[in-house]
Amino acid sequence: MSAVTRHHADELARGADELGVALDAEKKHQLLAYLALLIKWNKAYNLTAVRDPDEMVSRHLLDSLSIVPHAEAGDNWLDVGSGGGMPGVPLAILFPERRLTLLDSNGKKTRFLTQVKLELKLANLDVVHSRVEAFRPESPFDGIVSRAFSSLEDFANWTRHLGGQETRWLAMKGVHPNEELAALPEDFRVEAEHALAVPGCQGQRHLLILRRTA
């Protein structure tokens, strides 16, 4: 993990403490190993516009961890438009008892995610290269999460077939999406909203939890 320094480890530990997320030594090691892979592969694969490793800790790792206190929707999860693996990879590390499926239509990104699965030995992680509309899992997911993926309307419409009455949809947003909420499909409702304070991140962060009404 040559690109990852003690400073990054300390920043991760402090931020997790602020978020109230418990990290044992193994989970810290895995998160930092993931960060090292993200730094290495980003040079060729353009996984994220964030280039500074210091920013990656706050804007990717800690941002992903910020939803952990609200991610209580069962053991079978889908990360839609996972990209470089946020928040799916950190969630898979934090919850080894849960099954995490990472879905993305970009082949370069799914190749990277497959490498992460192999190198970090994440047996609970599945990587799927597909468009969300074409993805047909065997059973509904308990939780469906997206981070900077689409509008709430598109998120609901494109993933409706992937969940059921008990599913929670978690949409990670920046500023509060008032206009997007006005366009939310009639068969979805907002179950909860949370303003998130992510250590080291400027600007607003919000998490919206959606449920089906029919």
UniProtKB/Swiss-Prot annotation:
Main localization category: cytoplasm
Localization per record: Cytoplasm
Entry keywords, A to Z: Cytoplasm, Methyltransferase, rRNA processing, S-adenosyl-L-methionine, Transferase
MF annotations from Gene Ontology: rRNA (guanine-N7-)-methyltransferase activity
Catalytic reactions on record: guanosine(527) in 16S rRNA + S-adenosyl-L-methionine = N(7)-methylguanosine(527) in 16S rRNA + S-adenosyl-L-homocysteine
Residue stretches in coiled coil: none
Gene Ontology annotations for the cellular component aspect, listed alphabetically: cytosol
Alphabetical list of InterPro entries matching this protein: rRNA_ssu_MeTfrase_G, SAM-dependent_MTases_sf
Keyword Transferase: yes
Positions with a binding annotation for S-adenosyl-L-methionine: 81, 86, 132-133, 147
SUPFAM superfamilies documented for this protein: S-adenosyl-L-methionine-dependent methyltransferases
Enzyme class: transferase
EC number: 2.1.1.170
A Pfam family the protein falls into: GidB
Family: Belongs to the methyltransferase superfamily. RNA methyltransferase RsmG family.
NCBIfam families associated with the record: rsmG_gidB (TIGR00138)
Function of the molecule: Specifically methylates the N7 position of guanine in position 527 of 16S rRNA.
Name under which the protein is recorded: Ribosomal RNA small subunit methyltransferase G
Organism: Pseudomonas paraeruginosa (strain DSM 24068 / PA7) (Pseudomonas aeruginosa (strain PA7))
